[in-house]
Structures are given as C-alpha cells and as structure tokens.
Amino acid sequence: MKFNNKKNTFKKRRKVCFFTENKVTKIDFKDIELLQRFITDRGRILSRRVTNTSARWQRQLAIAIKRARHMALIPFIQQ
C-alpha cells in the first residue's frame, strides 16, 4: 500500500483471484496440495474475503473440497 500525502489515506491494491491470476482452467478434487491452501487448520473452508477468490472459483473450490472429503482424501475435521 502506498501512503498518499495529500489526503492522508492509503491506496489499496486491487485484490486478484488466485485462480484467474495463475490461469487455472479446472479445480481437481485430487489436487490435495492446492485444496489445503484454502482450508483452515481445523478443516473448515476459508471464505472469499480471506482467500481473495472470485465467486465462480469459490463455488468450484467448495465443491472440490467437499468431493475430496467424501473420497477420504481430506479429513472432515482435523483435531
């Protein structure tokens, strides 16, 4: 963030979606390393606000995480 002396405010950088920035075409539920970036330590899915993903990719991400949970690739709850 840059400090603007005229108005004494911060200029915010534009948030960019991880998936559009890296030109991902499809989120695969078998890609556990990618999915774990968007899950908390307790196993919950992180929100769009935290991950800076667009609505389209957040929906696909949630579906992929839920499929991976049902296929027992990711635990439902981590203790």
Curated annotation (Swiss-Prot):
Alphabetized UniProt keyword annotations: Ribonucleoprotein, Ribosomal protein, RNA-binding, rRNA-binding
RNA-binding as UniProt keyword: yes
Gene Ontology cellular component annotations, sorted alphabetically: cytosolic small ribosomal subunit
Classification via Gene3D superfamilies: Ribosomal protein S18 (4.10.640.10)
Pfam families documented for this protein: Ribosomal_S18
Domain of life: Bacteria
NCBIfam families from the UniProt entry: S18 (TIGR00165)
Entry-linked PANTHER family: 30S RIBOSOMAL PROTEIN S18, SMALL RIBOSOMAL SUBUNIT PROTEIN BS18M
Description of how the protein assembles with itself and partners: Part of the 30S ribosomal subunit. Forms a tight heterodimer with protein bS6.
Name of the protein in its database record: Small ribosomal subunit protein bS18
Provenance organism: Aster yellows witches'-broom phytoplasma (strain AYWB)
